[in-house]
Amino acid sequence: MKEVELTCKVGREISEDELRSAAAKALGVGLKAVGECRLVRRSVDARGDVIYRLRYQVCTAAEHLEGYAIPEYHDVRDAEPVIVAGAGPAGMFAALHLLMRGLKPVIIERGKNVHARKFDVARLSDKGVLNPDSNYCFGEGGAGTFSDGKLFTRSSKRGDIREVLHQFVRFGASESILTDAHPHIGSDRLPIVVENIRKCIVEHGGEYHFDSRITDISPGPDGGYDVVTLGGDGSATTYSARNIILATGHSARDIYELFNRKRWALEAK
């Protein structure tokens, strides 16, 4: 397998003959021996005349380019629960990985679902009325739900980034994010993607509890943890599990203050 880079002017496409010719040269074989060719990155070069830079993976006919294996999600209705605090990106993908491992995610989110959250955000923008638990920071999808969904990371050492991109495509994002140098989902699509992730989690037996702010976490009698939440109607509910994943985001200061009061370990990102 080799990588080749081709350029073309904006508005023009690379022909199959051009691509296969470049692939044959890179692989050191004849045209008939060229196998698969896959676009892996597209970027704009605006230095001088604006052009596209297109990077392809190519291989011989005797080889195969490695494909993406679609994760299998298990039915977890009767599986061991794991509490996930927060329904932002970290919480959603933690829940998906729990499904892959046969564990039941119980997602507790202080804000509202993405549809109901829109009205609280609009009320804040139009009238200055703040719902402290449902706003730009809190609610399904996390703080970036109502952005244009730019996707970037400063680290390539903490997991398979392409797996995340494929997951977004699976749940409704454009396939262009797999190849664009600066991918973004789009403000019109992002809430749909977030909702589709929730539907998948629930269909496989996971749980979502919105409008549920965590007020206490304490060791349970059987070695696990009891998590107490306060609902929007003022009612308290306790959830129990052996394990908790804290995906509370940067704005949940009350959670960090709770940990500090209990003298539990806290460290900077």
How should these model regions be labeled?
Residues 2-52, 56-146, 150-269:
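Residues forming the flavin
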